[in-house]
């Protein structure tokens, strides 16, 4: 048996695929899985009881994770004049206006999150076909269209993340690194869950958190009992 096969078998022996676990138990399972040579990301996948085809049931927002994601973000800010100077001072990795718009039109997307001042959105909006599919388009709902670029860049550095339901009503979000201690991972997941529950549309009927899975990059997907999460 190959090393890969042994690792997969070892993972499968750590938990019951058909069972739903408490959040703490699910994190323990991820921690007990055979290790790899890099620090894996802990991902959450949540199926929501919404109809994304309806405009009033499209979920998108942001949340500040108490312990950050463990990832060093490359932050881009669309701004001009004094706001551009503020963004540079705040530590944004890329700052510009029309020059950045043209660069992105040419296919460059080597950044993780984009922020824009309101006056830049007329030009930034033209990048929808490039930024939209990559979830990089600044939006007021996510807090990335703002006049306070200093505060926004600082929040992103500290662990503010965006979440968005796709066309199937599923949110996929990286919430931590596996090297975080279990309590830190749990608190980050709980913060995300609280934000998702708060974002529940008034028109959404029936069960809201339909399915909740937590996984690591090279590890299993462990189903979490949603009854615990709804109570947060």
Curated annotation (Swiss-Prot):
Keywords tagged on the record: Repressor, Ribonucleoprotein, Ribosomal protein, RNA-binding, rRNA-binding, Translation regulation, tRNA-binding
UniProt-listed GO biological process terms: regulation of translation; translation
UniProt key word RNA-binding: yes
GO molecular-function terms, A-Z: rRNA binding; structural constituent of ribosome; tRNA binding
InterPro entries: Ribosom_uL1_bac-type, Ribosomal_uL1, Ribosomal_uL1-like, Ribosomal_uL1/biogenesis, Ribosomal_uL1_3-a/b-sand, Ribosomal_uL1_CS
Superkingdom of this protein's organism: Bacteria
PROSITE patterns linked to this entry: RIBOSOMAL_L1
GO cellular component, one term: large ribosomal subunit
Functional summary from the UniProt entry: Binds directly to 23S rRNA. The L1 stalk is quite mobile in the ribosome, and is involved in E site tRNA release.
Family: Belongs to the universal ribosomal protein uL1 family.
Complex and partners: Part of the 50S ribosomal subunit.
PANTHER family: 54S RIBOSOMAL PROTEIN L1, MITOCHONDRIAL (PTHR36427), LARGE RIBOSOMAL SUBUNIT PROTEIN UL1M (PTHR36427:SF3)
HAMAP family membership: Ribosomal_uL1_B (MF_01318_B)
Protein name per UniProt: Large ribosomal subunit protein uL1
Annotated source species: Chlamydia trachomatis serovar D (strain ATCC VR-885 / DSM 19411 / UW-3/Cx)
Recorded name of the encoding gene: rplA
């Amino acid at each position: 048996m190959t090393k890969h096969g042994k690792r997969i078998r070892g993972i499968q022996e750590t938990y019951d695929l058909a069972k739903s676990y408490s959040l703490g138990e699910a994190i323990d399972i991820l921690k007990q899985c055979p290790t790899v040579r890099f620090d894996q990301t802990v991902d959450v996948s949540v199926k929501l009881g919404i109809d994304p085809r309806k405009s009033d049931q499209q979920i998108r927002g942001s949340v500040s994770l108490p312990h950050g994601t463990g990832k060093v973000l490359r932050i881009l800010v669309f701004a001009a004049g004094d706001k551009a100077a503020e963004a540079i001072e705040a530590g944004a990795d890329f700052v510009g206006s029309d020059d950045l718009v043209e660069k992105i039109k040419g296919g460059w997307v080597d950044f993780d999150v984009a922020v824009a001042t309101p006056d830049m959105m007329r030009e930034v909006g033209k990048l929808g076909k490039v930024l939209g599919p990559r979830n990089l388009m600044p939006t007021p709902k996510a807090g990335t269209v703002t006049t306070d670029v200093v505060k926004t860049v600082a929040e992103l550095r500290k662990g503010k993340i965006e979440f968005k339901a796709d066309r199937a009503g599923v949110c996929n979000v990286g919430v931590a690194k596996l090297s975080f201690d279990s309590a830190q991972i749990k608190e980050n997941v709980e913060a995300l869950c609280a934000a998702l529950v708060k974002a529940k549309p008034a028109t959404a009927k029936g069960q809201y958190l339909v399915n909740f899975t937590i996984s690591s990059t090279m590890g299993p997907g462990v189903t979490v009992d949603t009854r615990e999460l709804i109570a947060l």
